[in-house]
From Swiss-Prot:
Compartments where found: Plastid, Chloroplast
UniProt keyword terms in alphabetical order: Chloroplast, Plastid, Ribonucleoprotein, Ribosomal protein, RNA-binding, rRNA-binding
SUPFAM superfamilies on file: Alpha-L RNA-binding motif (SSF55174)
Limits of the S4 RNA-binding domain: 91-151
Taxonomic lineage of the native organism: Eukaryota, Viridiplantae, Streptophyta, Embryophyta, Tracheophyta
Species per Swiss-Prot/TrEMBL record: Welwitschia mirabilis (Tree tumbo)
Pfam family membership, one: S4
Principal location class: plastid
Descriptive protein name: Small ribosomal subunit protein uS4c
Subunit structure: Part of the 30S ribosomal subunit. Contacts protein S5. The interaction surface between S4 and S5 is involved in control of translational fidelity.
GO molecular function, one term: structural constituent of ribosome
Disulfide links within the chain: none
Length: 201
């Protein structure tokens, strides 16, 4: 299955807030609720698991095949499979660029990486799925450092986005540092990761 390139509001209305997919917010129409009305259908367990799986896919911009690969890696690792899965996804290079505030969304961060604007420990890395490790130093290649600082400050203030505790942003030198692997409590995406694992069992 290829990466989703269709309308993003359609996904947001169905799965609710996914900050990695889009920074915009759709307008919801107010529905008039009748006094004795009841929902005519109930969500099955399979549907709930499917929606949680789709949240991860669309938030991080993964294909079905990529997500399966991450789940297989998480199953072989020590610890909670769901927590390891989220940590693997959060430590992707495109997600780190997004979390630092350099890009508005993860697709925008992926484009920055693909265009070879990112250096990891002094080397150009153009693979968005590159797994960052503790003590990695990320630098952005730019001809106008002042403009980059303005973009970062604008993204952080407009979307009220704080740099997570596992990262450090040095605006003076236009670089970010990965301090450690992210903790589960610091992950911003509202997700029930064990339902995703259950979906693939």
């Amino acid at each position: 299955m290829s990466r989703y390139l269709g309308p993003r509001f359609k996904i947001i209305r169905r799965l609710k807030t996914l900050p990695g997919l889009t920074s915009k917010r759709p307008k919801y129409k107010k529905r008039v609720r009748r006094r004795f009305s009841r929902p005519w259908w109930k969500k099955s367990q399979h549907l709930i698991c499917l929606q949680e799986k789709q949240k991860i896919r669309f938030h991080y911009g993964l294909t079905e095949r990529q997500l399966r690969q991450y789940i297989n890696i998480a199953k072989r690792a020590q610890g909670s499979t769901g927590q390891v899965l989220l940590q693997l996804l959060e430590m992707r290079l495109d997600n780190i660029i997004f979390q630092l505030g350099i890009a508005r969304t993860i697709p925008a961060a992926r484009q920055i990486v693909n265009h070879r604007h990112v250096l990891v420990n002094g080397r150009v890395v153009d693979i968005p799925s590159y797994r960052c490790k503790p003590q990695d130093v990320l630098t952005i290649k730019t001809k106008n450092p002042e403009e980059l600082r303005t973009i970062i400050n604008k993204n952080r203030s407009k979307f009220r986005r704080k740099v997570p505790y596992h990262l450090t942003l040095d605006l003076a030198q236009n670089k970010g540092i990965v301090n450690k692997i992210i903790d589960r409590k610091d992950i911003q995406l509202k997700i029930q990761e064990m339902l995703v694992i259950e979906y693939y069992c």
